[in-house]
Structure formats: C-alpha cells, structure tokens
Curated annotation (Swiss-Prot):
Source organism (scientific name): Sordaria equina
GO cellular component: nucleus
Domain of life: Eukaryota
Role this protein plays: Mating type proteins are sequence specific DNA-binding proteins that act as master switches in fungal differentiation by controlling gene expression in a cell type-specific fashion. Transcriptional activator that induces the transcription of alpha-specific genes.
Annotated protein name in UniProt: Mating type protein mtA-1
Length: 294
C-alpha cells in the first residue's frame, strides 16, 4: 500500500474532532507565500460583428418563406438578394445600425425593429408587398418541388432619402421608433460625432458618376447647370484655355500665387450674372440638386 493510501485510510478512521486537528496540522506544514494573489483579469467584451446589407435583408424578408424548410429558404433569399436593386440602401441602413448597435440593444431595440422603421425612410418595399412588387412568385416545378419564379421586372424608383445616419435616426424616431426608446439622446449624440456617423449619397450610381464628371470637367458642368444661351454658360465657353494662375509681386515679401486677370474678370461676370433675379430657377435647382428644364 502506497504512502498516500495509508494517509487517506488513517484519515478516514479518525474521529470528527481528530480530523479537524489533522487538517490544521497539514495546513500548518504547507509553505506560506508572501506574494499577493493576482486578481482574475476581466476580458473586454468582444466587439460584435458588423451587420452587412445582406444580413439585414435576410432578417427582414426571410419570414416570407417561414413555412419552408431551411434548405429551401436560404437559396431563395440568396436569389432575391442577387436581383434586389437596393444593395446600397441596405448597406447604409445596416452600417448605421452597426454604429449604434450597443446603444439600441441596451434599450431592447433589435435589428428587425430598426429595419421596420428604416425601410420606410429609405423608400424600400415592405415585406408584405415585396414579392408582388418585384414580380416574384413561388410555384411548383414539373417534378412537384417548390421553386421561385419571376414573372415581371418592374421599373425601380428611388425617393429622396436621408443624407446621413443622424438624419435616418431622426426620421425613424419621428415615425414611431421613439416609443421603443426610453432615452434616445445618447444615441443622437453619438451620431452627431463624425467618427460614428456616415454619409449617404442619395442618388443612383450613374447619377453619382455624372456629378464626378461635371466636377472634373467644367465644360461638361456648365451646360448641365444652365441652358446653352444663358449668360453664365457663355462666360465659361473657353474656361479650359484660360491661364488660371500667375505670380504677383508682393514687395519685400516675395511672390505669392494668384489668379490671372482674365480668370478674375470671367469669375466676376459669372457671379454678377448668376445672382441676377432671373436666375432664381437655376439657383434653386443648384441648392436642391434637382434636374432642371429650360
């Protein structure tokens, strides 16, 4: 019998009082450490995964197929997402949600509830009308299985949408989200911080490219803002050929960059014509970023 077994057997045969005395004797023989006991290190909460557009899309529309098995729902959701024209809008909504997710969850606002209010502000189709609006239907194939069919491809329209995350949040609060939040002010304050907010360009991609081209090429930009016979358009007819800068003598302080006389004259004329009352139609269009006629 080993020494350990003998000790255990002997300890088991001791009376209750003797056992306690034996335990104290064992503890007294153990070495005492003067080193402080390290406190357990608390792990920082793991950052939650950012919600992307498809995750939000699936969360909102997957109940359309709730009566089908999972192996059928997933492919159908992938097909709907593939042909959905609002990927940018979904990415924007979910980016805003991700930036304030912790604050919303603390007040029991789920992703589904956020989307319920956000899609109306983004001009997206609600769940009950989605399939019919985009020409989708479920039907039976020849072998009797259920499949997804598209019978029509409708025109897509986009409404004027919120310009940033704070604007989207405010519109959601106004449309009813506020009744689910006991204190929305910290969330509003967070989105007022540019490091948390994000900007949304509320135009289709081909319109965005058009603005880029106009900004890079003034000869494209002016005809898009004013009719061909307008005084302002005539002023910039040869802007690409003007010398834009020169060096002006500044006495003892050397030279500094400036604009050429030709360019200064042209700019003054543009501003004078542009501020004329007859141009209010164009000034308003510029301010509102709307297409113009005339």
């Amino acid at each position: 019998m080993s020494g350990v077994d003998q000790i255990v057997k002997k300890f088991a045969n001791l009376g209750e009082g003797d056992r306690e005395a034996a335990m104290k004797a064992f503890l007294a023989m153990m070495p005492v450490s003067n080193e402080p006991v390290a406190e357990p290190v608390r792990k920082a909460p793991t950052a939650k995964k950012k919600v992307n557009g498809f995750m939000g899309f699936r969360s909102n529309y997957s109940p359309l197929f709730s009566y089908l098995p999972q192996k059928m729902r997933s492919p159908f959701m992938t097909i709907l997402w593939q042909y959905d024209p609002y990927h940018n809008e979904w990415d924007f909504m979910c980016s805003v949600y991700s930036s304030i997710r912790t604050d919303l969850e603390e007040q029991n606002v789920t992703l589904q509830l956020w989307i319920h209010y956000a899609i109306g502000q983004m001009g997206l189709i609600d769940r009950d009308h989605y399939m019919a609006s985009f020409g989708w239907r479920l039907g039976q194939t020849r072998n009797g299985t259920t499949d997804l069919f598209r019978t029509a491809i409708p025109m897509v329209r986009r409404n004027l949408q919120p310009m940033n995350g704070l604007c989207l949040l405010i519109k959601c609060l106004e449309s009813g989200l506020s009744k689910h939040l006991t204190n929305p002010h910290p969330i509003i304050a967070k989105l007022q911080d540019p490091s948390f907010d994000m900007i949304w360009i509320n135009k289709p991609p081909h319109h965005q490219q058009g603005h880029t081209d106009q900004a890079d090429n003034s000869e494209l930009g002016m005809p898009s803002l004013f009719p061909g016979n307008h005084a302002v358009a005539a002023e910039v007819d040869g802007i690409a050929n003007l010398p834009l800068s020169h060096r002006t003598q500044q006495g003892d302080f050397g030279t500094e960059p400036g604009f050429s006389t030709q360019f200064d004259t042209m700019l003054d004329s543009i501003l004078e014509n542009g501020n004329h009352p007859s141009n209010s139609h164009y000034n308003m269009s510029l301010a509102m970023d709307l297409p113009m006629t005339g």
